[in-house]
Each structure stands twice: as structure tokens, then as C-alpha cells.
Regions:
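Beta-rich accessory regions
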Residues: 1-157
Length: 157
């Protein structure tokens, strides 16, 4: 179902930095590897379905609790739920976090470290373009690799 691919390579974000990786994403797959040892951010990850009104769903690693989170607190519509997946001591010691994130118009699925943990959540975006942004909160972020695949429609419009 992949239509085209954008390889961003390695990305470094400064303290509390933000980088838009796509201005309007309808259906995408994101493969991202974070260097946990070289990152200092308290929370770092992706703002999904980010719209001009400030709404988004946050897929992030929270260093303070050692978990990957899907946080819908900033959603404009629907439930504002919060899901987490803990990283094991071995995963934390490895110093690397692999995320595979699938996004469509109303859903976010996150596969942590090759599917060892999986998070799935509804994510209803506001009207207008739905950006995806790479974010570092209260520290820096070192991404070893980031690849975005635009996905074809399966024709259920």
C-alpha cells in the first residue's frame, strides 16, 4: 500500500525543538529510531493530526516514566484518553527506541521495538490540513533515522 517514501535520515532537535515532517498527512507509515542515550528531552516524539487550532495527538517517549505514550489530551474532538506502554529494563539499557506508527484519518497505531508493545487509539483531527511534527520537550532529541511512507487509499471513502 506504500505510495511514495521520504527518507529524512538522522535528525537532531535542539532544546524544546519542533520540526514539521509533513504538512498534510492523510494516511502514512512512519519508521523512527530514537537514540535514547543521546537525547535529553523529558518527552519526545510526534504530534499527529496537528491542526492550525493547536489540536493534535501525541505519540512520544516519556523519559520520566520510561514509557511510550499516546496522549490525546490536546485533541479538539472525541475522548481525550491516554495510553502507555512500558519499556523493559533491557530495552532501556539498549539505549534505542524503534517506533513504527501508522496514521490514517481517524486512527493511530504504534508498534514499539518491533511489536513488543502495541498501542492503538482513535484520533479525530480538526478540519483542515493535518500535519505531523517531530517534537522535543525540555531537552534535545537525537533521531537516528526517520522514514515516512505515504499510503494509498483502499477505496472506502
Amino acid at each position: 500500500l506504500r505510495e511514495d517514501t521520504v527518507d529524512f535520515g538522522a535528525i537532531d532537535l535542539d532544546v524544546s525543538g519542533e520540526k514539521t515532517i509533513v504538512d498534510d498527512a492523510e494516511a502514512v507509515e512512519i519508521e523512527m529510531t530514537i537514540d535514547l542515550n543521546a537525547s535529553t528531552a523529558e518527552r519526545a516524539g510526534l504530534k499527529i493530526h496537528a491542526t492550525e487550532d493547536g489540536a493534535y495527538t501525541y505519540v512520544a517517549y516519556d523519559d520520566q516514566i520510561g514509557r511510550v505514550v499516546v496522549d490525546r489530551q490536546a485533541n479538539a474532538q472525541g475522548d481525550r484518553g491516554y495510553r502507555t506502554a512500558p519499556l523493559s529494563e533491557a530495552e532501556l539499557a539498549a539505549g534505542e527506541l524503534k517506533l513504527r506508527v501508522y496514521v490514517d484519518r481517524g486512527c493511530v497505531e504504534v508498534y514499539v521495538n518491533d511489536g513488543r508493545q502495541v498501542l492503538s487509539s482513535y484520533s479525530y483531527a480538526s478540519e483542515g490540513p493535518r500535519a505531523i511534527k517531530l517534537v522535543a520537550e525540555s531537552g534535545t532529541l537525537k533521531v537516528k533515522s526517520l522514514v515516512l511512507h505515504h499510503m494509498k487509499s483502499i477505496g472506502l471513502e
